[in-house]
Amino acid sequence: MSVEPIVDTAPAVSDEVRKTTCYMCACRCGINVHLRDGKIRYIEGNRDHPVNQGVLCAKGSAGIMQHYSPARLQSPMKRVGPRGSGQFEPISWEEALQTAVDWLAPIRKDDPKKLAFFTGRDQSQALTGWWAQQFGTPNFAAHGGFCSVNMAAGGIYTLGGAFWEFGSPDWDLTELFILFGVAEDHDSNPIKMGLGKLKTRGARVISVNPVQTGYAAISDDWYGVTPGTDGLLILSLVRELMRAGKIDIDYLVRYTNAPWLVIRNPGAANDGLFLRDADGTQQVIDRATGKPAPHTDAKVKAALQGEVPVEGGGVAVPAFMLMADAYLTDEYAPEAVAPQVGISAERIRQLAADLAEAAFAKEVVIEQPWTDWKGEKHDRMVGRPVSMHAMRGISAHSNGFQTCRALHMLQLLLGSVEAPGGFRFKPPYPKPPHAHPKPAGRPDQVAPETPLGGAPLGYVLGPEDLIIGADGAPQRIDKAYSWDAPMSAHGMMHMVISNAVAGDPYKVDVMFMYMANMAWNSSMNTRGVMDMLTETDPDTGEYKIPKLIYSDAYSSEMVAYADLVLPCLLYTSPSPRDYAASRMPSSA
């Protein structure tokens, strides 16, 4: 009898392991990169990472192909032919950096806003935003401005955070999980792990998506909504839940601004503002006295209905009454919205009934004493086991901001935010807009050879925070934070090239793009963008964007239109210190 040879079933694939974060999608999973003789041999999930807990998808595993792609840029280059021709010659890092300094130094000395610096994916935004601030230009923004900023901003302004990086559903207690327009590249592995938990427990999964693919393929029910009409569907659900009384009144009174008094004084300057006391604290109607009282007073039990007179004219009513007036109308009846959303009135009512049943017939009770924000003590925690997730599918529309706010409002009406079984934030969220920085870039915040007077991106709270001049004109090249787009929390990267070419609101001298392939990915106008990048001034013959620096890891479409190309690191590259020591001159 022959003896079978001993086979090593777990051979060592590496002599070194580096830990990093995967950038193959927006999920940001932790990975272990195995190297042998300095070469990447294998990529696996990091079991100690909180995002993916060791899970890695096929795209993440294929990161090795990205690292060794033949399209990787190997050295700095300068353009020697017309823009778009792809004619370059390699140059040294010393020459490349000196060229960049020669172009940028005069701008910082004379007028920093003549530099427009815009980046792609936001993983490096802490560094790139800081660099822009130190340079002194207000013209900085990142990828989010034409991706899912409506979701992030809508969430921050409504409840202090949105989905994805802000938190996640309570996978262990949720009874009904609804996905609105979710693509597989946002929160990929955590969502898959969560869906696995739900399916194992027998919880329901509903998909609202124009196509039944990906996650929708494993859902228990699918609503094929007409693209761009999710908000109308959501508001119809709001109407049905309010009509049926299936909303969490106690939650709204205690933890939202539903009882805050709003001034109704048509034509007056204070119309639509919150009623405040002399200290600026928002007021509610005290159920015991029927009079206004600070919403922060622990002794006050606020009312959701009522009316009080306002000194100087008009009345003030709870915000909840304005919501009821707006949505308890025939405009949002299922029969009225059905033709537009592509879903029958009967099915819309069924979805509302499913929400109500999960939230109120299956409420979660945890016998755990706790103290709320007012200092009031409670014997138990009561949760509404309904959770939701949405991203670009509902946000990337002209009505995306308000659609996202409607979805967050629906969660609040059900009482399913920051409650057992619902959506749970992770630190440091929730953070309301006033806890975030305000954007800097007003004329008094921009000065030669001086850092910008604050962060270039942020959240405006009123007209006084807009980045405009004394005449009301936009001060940023993308017109973000102006009357054109006052709540553009991540800036508007997709407007940069067209505005710079048009000289509206002004011209720029240098455009610096980092990992941002705008020649290809620019509001579905790639041909127009390529034409703009090569457009010349008829009087001078010079390009309307005089100088363009581009930093990327690959020879993308944008590289062909750059004047100076700077290779960039990948997430699988050595550390910046190692990279600099091996590839850059000491003078850099």
Walk through the language-model features, giving the residues of each:
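A glycine-rich, hydrophobic/aromatic-adjacent loop/helix-cap motif
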Residues: E335, L351-D504
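Ordered core of a single globular domain
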Residues: D504-V508, F512-D537
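Conserved small/polar residues in nucleotide/adenosyl-binding loops
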Residues: Y571-D578
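Acidic/polar loop patches that form or flank catalytic/metal-binding clefts of enzymes
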Residues: I247-Y251, E346-R349, K362-V364, S387, ...
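A short helix->loop->beta-strand "cap" motif at the edges of active sites that frequently abuts
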Residues: L198-R204, P538-K547
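Short, polar loop motifs at secondary-structure junctions
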Residues: N209-T213, S551-E557
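N-terminal export/assembly segments and adjacent metallocofactor-ligating motifs
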Residues: M1-D250, R254-G306, A316, L322-A324, ...
